[in-house]
Amino acid sequence: MAADDHIEMEGVVEEALPGTLFRVVLENGHEVLAHLCGKMRKFRIRVLPGDKVTVHISPYDLTKGRIARRTTTPSGGPRPARSGNRR
């Protein structure tokens, strides 16, 4: 697969699943299961529910994707509150 052979969409992380998987709701309302790209894992960029992300989706399987970037909020304010225990 070529480097530019993907569909790039914006979405919001709805749920964090085990094994660095995330359920992301795209702008058009579709849900995809997405994992973190290698650079985000390498630099330990945290993605939490409520974060706005850019997802690369393969044209061959539109239900799975790769989180390529976490975008910041335009206001620069605090991030959404986390639920659950913190490690």
UniProtKB/Swiss-Prot annotation:
Protein family membership:
Belongs to the IF-1 family.
Q: What name does UniProt use for this protein?
A: Translation initiation factor IF-1 2
Primary location recorded for the protein, binned into one broad class: cytoplasm
Location(s), subcellular:
Cytoplasm
Pfam assignment, any one: eIF-1a
Positions of the UniProt region annotated as Disordered: 65-87
Tell me which species this is from: Nitratidesulfovibrio vulgaris (strain ATCC 29579 / DSM 644 / CCUG 34227 / NCIMB 8303 / VKM B-1760 / Hildenborough)
Query: Which keywords has UniProt assigned to this entry?
Result: Cytoplasm, Initiation factor, Protein biosynthesis, RNA-binding, rRNA-binding
